[in-house]
Swiss-Prot record:
Disulfide bonds: none annotated. It catalyses: L-arginyl-[protein] + 2 S-adenosyl-L-methionine = N(omega),N(omega)-dimethyl-L-arginyl-[protein] + 2 S-adenosyl-L-homocysteine + 2 H(+). It is linked to Intellectual developmental disorder, autosomal recessive 44: A disorder characterized by significantly below average general intellectual functioning associated with impairments in adaptive behavior and manifested during the developmental period. MRT44 manifestations include mild to severe cognitive impairment, delayed psychomotor development, seizures in some patients, and dysmorphic features. This is Histone-arginine methyltransferase METTL23. Keywords: Chromatin regulator, Cytoplasm, Developmental protein, Disease variant, Intellectual disability, Methyltransferase, Nucleus, S-adenosyl-L-methionine, Transferase. GO terms for biological process: cognition; epigenetic programing of male pronucleus; epigenetic programming in the zygotic pronuclei; epigenetic regulation of gene expression; methylation; positive regulation of transcription by RNA polymerase II. The lineage of its organism: Eukaryota, Metazoa, Chordata, Craniata, Vertebrata.
Length: 190
């Protein structure tokens, strides 16, 4: 199991806001090892973990993380970005959607935002808390956010003590450039 640098930064953001998490409905997409979702569950949130329905190994990694962290009751569902599936339709409204480094391949960006848009219609006040590793100055979400009627706030890493090369005595996030984003519906769409 590998923990990506962005997962540690998102977990730090969750830890900084841990007092607001109990009872919140939280979905982690592209969860993998599920560090942010596991932490949210440990802080009292009602968490659902998800990864690609096309990659059963990834779903098994989510389940293993739950077992290793004494959270066998957490629901793990297969979701494929951009596809409306029965599992996606069955999800209850969420308060927060977690996404650690899901904006990895530009060809997936719109499918991710389409899935988020669908979930936002279940609860227009839901927020996407996402960490993003800058891999190319040419990649941007701005046009797609506008297209999907969403807005984005960049959260300074120093505002939640994540502006270091190591967090929680780990070597992560290292020297990677990571951004913390909070994405929601644009104001005029509410």
């Amino acid at each position: 199991m590998y923990v990506w640098p962005c997962a540690v930064v998102l977990a730090q953001y969750l830890w900084f806001h841990r007092r607001s998490l109990p009872g919140k409905a939280i979905l982690e997409i592209g969860a993998g090892v599920s560090l942010p979702g596991i932490l949210a569950a440990k802080c009292g949130a009602e968490v659902i973990l998800s990864d690609s329905s096309e990659l059963p190994h990834c779903l098994e990694v989510c389940r293993q993380s739950c077992q290793m962290n004494n959270l066998p009751h957490l629901q793990v569902v297969g979701l494929t970005w951009g596809h409306i599936s029965w599992d996606l339709l069955a999800l209850p409204p969420q308060d927060i959607i977690l996404a650690s480094d899901v904006f990895f391949e530009p060809e997936d960006f719109e499918d991710i935002l389409a899935t988020i848009y669908f979930l936002m219609h279940k609860n227009p006040k839901v927020q996407l808390w996402s960490t993003y590793q800058v891999r190319s100055a040419d990649w941007s979400l701005e046009a797609l956010l506008y297209k999907w009627d969403m807005k984005c706030v960049h959260i300074p890493l120093e505002s939640f003590d994540a502006d270091k090369e190591d967090i929680a005595e780990s070597t992560l996030p290292g020297r990677h450039t990571v951004e913390m984003l909070v994405i929601s519906f644009a104001k005029d769409s509410l």
